[in-house]
Amino acid sequence: MARIALKVDVDTLRGTREGVPRLLASLERASAKATFLFSLGPDHTGWALRRAFRPGFLAKVQRTSVLAHYGLRTLMYGVLLPAPDIGREAASAMRAARDAGFECGIHCWDHVVWQDNVRRRDAAWTGSQMTLAFDRFAEVFGAPPATHGAAGWQMNAAAFRRIDAWGMAYASDGRGTGPYLPQIEGVALAHVQLPTTLPTLDELIGTDGIDAGNVATALLGLTEADRDQVFTLHAELEGGLLAPAFDALLSGWRAQGHALVDLGGLFAGLDRRRLPTLPIAWGEVPGRSGELIVAPVARAGAR
């Protein structure tokens, strides 16, 4: 039986307040586990409009109807409306995920600021952002986070090292084909990376005739084999208009015989000694604008 680890990125105040409760209900109906990764500071979603000048961004917006999924109010945060503090205004919604038995971790402090800046920032800036997120998580939950999953799959060397410094055993900060030990400047880090292996729904919708009505079928076609996977979903999407597609995925994965686990559940079944050691790299992913953290394909016998 293969395991599919479900990783929920929660980017916005609306996603935290509205999407998370809906996802909890869907997951509980399916007896599925998942890891919720929270944005813990200000919601500056409106600042993301600056990405309109990046190659591929407008095409993605047109394919996935950002306004319908995020709402006008969210798109005004940081532009025409002040940015709300998610960790202050929606702490109870975050704790509800933990109280329902779901693994919780850090997504970021400020989603837009992290995604748009971390690649070129230094260790001091990175440490400051991550410390803000860590401290707020501890304030909200009364305990340290279990794991980390970077906003927009954007990282730098200092961020990977900070995960080691926190003592986290595993994280999910990039894209790839399977678990690996990340290597920075020739040195293997202590934690295991569990990269997202499957395309997200918004990467598939609008391509090759795929829409919200058949996207679940398209994705299920990629999970027929008995192979572990990591799937990233978003509270704003699968916890909103794409909820029917997500429910169809949950049913389909059960029918395929897969176990639906959280990141911790996937990590628990790994033999660290058999994992490849791979350098951190950047690359493009179909349906996603810009470059992301990617794991090079492991060569046979790589360690």
Locations of regions flagged by a protein language model:
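Catalytic alpha-helical scaffold of carbohydrate-active enzymes acting on polysaccharides/glycoconjugates
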Residues: M1-T147, G152-V192, I210-F231, G239-R303
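Positively charged, amphipathic and often flexible ligand-engagement surfaces
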Residues: Q193-D208
